Amino acid sequence: MQVDSAFSIDYDFVKELKTRTGGKKMSETGLTTLSYVNTVIRERPREIHKGQCGRVLIVAGSVGMAGACVLSTGAALRCGAGLVKAAVPEEIFPILQIAVPQATCTNVSDREFLRSVSVHDAIGIGPGMGVSEKKYKLIEEILSLFDGPVVIDADGITNLCRFGKKTEILKGRENVVLTPHPGECDRLLD
């Protein structure tokens, strides 16, 4: 089945891949190898400053779902981003700042952070952010202000499916990556 909208996925290929790999991890299939990863992720030179390694904004987390934000913020740092800012509810600042002290926090409820989205090199949206029309409107606003690379995951995808016209707001953008789990993928393709 071919789906044409803001993205294109050959769902039959995904099913075929699962069948052929027998559910093995990608690293066990030879599709992703350590030698390939080493060509993509390189050791950072010692003399480089963190400000030269990219700025990432993570819009994630909510009361009761701080862990999702901790994991995604930490992942951005481990993947090499020099400066990572998390836009989260103020109530979870202490959790994030203890778990990922290298990251900075901004209050997602104070729309002030939207003025500076363009200074980032990439944005991650969704993990644990919660699902509501207000969250969908926030995603819409971020996408209207930022034309760089965006990764939308978890609750971000659910918000697109529930309150938007799925991927309609992504049309014309080539730099958006959706990372659905099987249930989210079903909602996107439904």
List the model feature ranges, each with a label:
Residues 48-107:
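Substrate-binding N-lobe of the ribokinase-like
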